[in-house]
């Protein structure tokens, strides 16, 4: 049952929470995460927001933008995205302009389940660690998603350790967008670990466990960050919504949320990815398609090397066929894609639909892309 009693329903829907968020959910999260990971969290380490997009609006404006150094001096600080492409929703959250610095990825050819035709993005640490903005104190935070929207890439434990060390070296936080990651919804297939300490800000969401409409985001951070987020909640929303908290709290307390993630959500999307890969190989196996190694999330990232048109044009062509994808160039936040052809050769494809819809869309992608390559040969 969603509500244990009429009194419980009145408490959750008829009253505001405090600006930090619903106390029962915060307590349940504290107990759950300490039990799973041994982090020694307290309620002072957790704040709730009205969705993870709301959380990133707060965090990117707290750590990025214009900072006053003295009465007559200010400095612009950017959010550093250590590996682009990244989540398109980050792009416009700053109140004043865009404040991002991004690094192009290293592209490595890999196999997936014994098959060729795949690649994986790696962080280019040589380029990252030599960024002038880092050396000049013009970076306010480092942020990455894991698994990554749009590619399904999962940064390795080694990459995360180096990003953590880099953030600490420069006295800035490492923000990790965990919307698709462990422990819920756990749409992640790589053998990796999840770490936290007070220089790391972890962001979670209830959206990918099937509750996007309740708009519940979760921030795990140092107490001073939680206090700042709570103050912003008070100004912007008075308090976060409690409906998602009412649903999630008992599911965390009795372990059903983890069971749902491990036994239903994760296997479903893994099977969807396998099905989509097989269909893409069938439709475009003889053409220059490369697929980012599916390591998590609910998308596939497709690279059509030397595509005769831009991914934006491909989007328009597929839209006319009744199939929607997202052009890759929009995900390279902070990078000038005019000088980076790879960005214009990639698309993001959702795998969340039923198999019949998935096959229909992939058949359309195959038909249009084959036509483009075949026309280019003439």
List each model region and its residues:
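Generic structural signal for small/hydrophobic residues in well-ordered secondary structure
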Residues: 29, 46, 80, 142, ...
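Structural signature of PLP-dependent enzymes
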Residues: 230-236, 254-278, 307
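Conserved core of the PLP fold type I
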Residues: 1, 7-170, 175-197, 201, ...
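Conserved glycine-rich beta-strand-loop-beta hairpin in the small C-terminal domain of fold type I
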Residues: 263-277, 289-304, 342
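Short, conserved charged micro-motifs
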Residues: 308-314, 356-360
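Active-site PLP attachment segment
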Residues: 182, 191-231, 239-243, 358, ...
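N-terminal basic, amphipathic alpha-helical segments
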Residues: 1-5, 234, 240, 363, ...
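PLP-dependent enzyme catalytic core of the Aspartate aminotransferase-like
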Residues: 23-27, 31, 35, 39-40, ...
